[in-house]
Amino acid sequence: MKLGITEYIDCAHHLPGHTKCGQLHGHTYTIDVVIEGEKKGGMIVDFADLKTAVKNVLNEYDHRSFNEFLDYPSVENICELIGGKLITQLPYSFTIRVWEGHGKYAELNVTK
């Protein structure tokens, strides 16, 4: 069974050498995290516990520039960055989808 949450962070970034996105600008990123697991005691995990684990990772980036963490903060690299941190926080297989504005996203699947 799958269980998911959505969180939001506001961050700036610029893509060095890119004509349009080379200037510093910001986005409200939508982060979807969907875990997969077996129900135990009627649920996979309490939503509050899942939200806490995800927020603990996202709080590091909220209202900051992704250029502090990545040389080239494309949405693909941002997705890998956040997904890599979630690997240590979530004992489940999961999918993370990072939306950069409306209609544009990168997705990473992690199997445990």
Named regions from a protein language model:
Residues M1-K112:
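Charge-rich, low-complexity N-terminal segments
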